[in-house]
């Protein structure tokens, strides 16, 4: 059921989320999606990076006052980048700001993940490919508007519940709490 739904999502575009998915809370409100993502043990997208090494750079001001809709994970060029969860690759391309980028939908189609500034893609990675958590998708780089700066992965997450299966940048989610559990006193 899940595999057939992901294939349909990759080939046909927006569809209703699979009824059997254990992650349907991601298709509710943004708060519900954040809570479920934080509880779901996502893989940190850069190999070898631990939660304590992450910096919450979400909403930091960028050029022309635009907010940063992601977190940046600084690592050397060529460090492996992996899929944070099961899903489908919906874009492997380049753009002006992100350079070499990959877009992934989670298994519900209600959350999209954006990986940018890649030095290169994993061999054979292509649009429509099903991936599991931890699948190699590329390598840290400095492409796009990161050229000349420190190499890093620009990692974004987006809530797509209003149009499941259609990647859009309208509702950014802060990825930092998805990986870092707050200390309890």
Each model region followed by its residue ranges:
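Conserved, short, structured surface segments that act as functional micro-motifs
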Residues: 103, 129-185
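Zn2+-dependent peptidoglycan hydrolase active-site motif and core
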Residues: 84-127, 150-154
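Core beta-strand residues in small-molecule sensory/regulatory alpha/beta domains
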Residues: 74, 82, 124, 130, ...
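Surface-exposed, glycine-biased beta-strand/turn segments
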Residues: 13-100, 133, 142, 172-185
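Generic beta-structure capping elements
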Residues: 57, 76, 107, 118, ...
């Amino acid at each position: 059921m899940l595999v057939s739904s992901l294939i349909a999502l990759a080939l046909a575009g927006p569809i209703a989320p699979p009824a059997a998915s254990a992650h349907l809370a991601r298709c509710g409100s943004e708060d519900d999606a954040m809570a479920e993502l934080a509880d779901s043990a996502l893989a940190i997208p850069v190999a070898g990076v631990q939660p304590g090494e992450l910096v919450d750079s979400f909403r930091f001001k960028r050029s022309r006052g635009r907010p940063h809709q992601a977190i940046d994970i600084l690592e050397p060029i060529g460090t492996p980048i992996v899929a944070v969860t099961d899903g489908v690759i919906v874009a492997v391309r380049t753009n002006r700001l992100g350079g070499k980028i990959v877009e992934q939908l989670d298994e519900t189609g209600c959350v999209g993940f954006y990986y940018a500034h890649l030095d290169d893609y994993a061999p054979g990675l292509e649009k429509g490919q099903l991936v599991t958590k931890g699948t190699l998708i590329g390598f840290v780089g400095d492409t796009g508007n990161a050229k000349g700066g420190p190499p890093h992965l620009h990692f974004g997450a987006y809530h797509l519940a209003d149009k499941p299966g259609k990647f859009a940048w309208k509702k950014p989610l802060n990825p930092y709490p998805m990986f870092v559990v707050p200390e309890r006193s």
